[in-house]
Amino acid sequence: MRIFLSTLGVLFLMSFLFIMPAVLGPSTTPQPSTSPVLSAAPTPSPAAAQEIRAVWVSFLEWQHTDFSSESAFRADAAAIMQNIASLGANTVFAHVRPFGDALYPSRYFPFSHLCTGTQGQDPGFDPLAVLVETAHAQGLTLEAWINPYRLQANGTPAELCAQSPALLHPNWVKHTATGLYLDPASIKVQQYLADSIRELCTNYAIDGIHFDDYFYPTTAPDFDADSYAASGSTISLADWRRQNVNDLMRACYAAAHAFNVRFGVSPQGTLSGCRDGQYSDAALWLAKPGYCDYLIPQLYWGLNYRKNGSDALSLGRLAAEWLSLPRTESVQLAFGLGAYRIGDGDEGDTSGPGSEWCTGHALATQATTLRSLGASGAALYRYAFLFANTLYPTLAEQEIAALREVWG
């Protein structure tokens, strides 16, 4: 965690920084800086390693959060943070930039449609400032969860405003059948994203920057055939795509570390899915410094998972595979657990009423197992399936109680 000095001068400075975003204004349209993308990554890690006990709060939670006023949002945010702290968790991954839009005033991205229903519309207060304050009040660290490339997916948001990068910089955008994405190959995009991280770290007392598993949205060659051809690269398309993501990782790591802020990623649960599905070279990021401070692969299957008799995707098998990889000392390796599986199961051979997901202690047992294997901790996806579970409220309450025994 970042170390905060309890002097009046620092408190005054932090208060000033919370106010700064309001003067930036989302109407300003900066160009990416001319600083090199691949700047040297400082070491060591900005935070002393401790067990990661985290909860994701996604844009889906924000859809049920009251943004009508600062006081209403503050009440909801405080309740969320209090609940998370009650688990014995120490970290919140708060979704603050889900679709090329932001839960804070930014020079680079418009206000999110989640704040008012209309992308680009100012809610009249700064949601991220409230999230940081309410998290820290509960002794939690707050990491800003960002989707770097995604601008629109499956019709969300329904309309993009004039300040969306999709409209401001159409030559930076790639299309799929279901969405719009920033071009991972574009040096300008990489610089723009790194600059936006500098903005976050300058204006807020965040403890980390967090990416999830949304990198390349497709394996289709025509997604970026023009960019690949223009690059003149002699390496394969797949290796070229991985190189583009690696370049972004190094740039964002360096940007965060310049402010002593952690930078981490939650990639897909299988190494093949990472490497060949989304072109994220997670094994490299684990093995070499300068890419991230932690990885949290998403292992959303149970310990007893079997599919057609195979346990290849069981949590224990996958965790052991990840833990056997070469790992540099500065990178933690924790794992994401699927709280959304409570009651429903993981679609395995034994999924259903008799499965581990109906015991009331699936997540606690998984977290304990990961701890015994030497993992750096666990993160739970996602908040609502524990604290707003209308389908399986009793099971969710039992899972919460069991987690408190493990994390408390």
What are these regions (language model features)?
Residues 48-75, 132, 143-199, 203, ...:
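Active-site-adjacent "subsite" loops/lids of carbohydrate-active enzymes
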Residues 75-102, 203-208, 290-294, 372-377:
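Catalytic domains of carbohydrate-active enzymes, especially glycoside hydrolases
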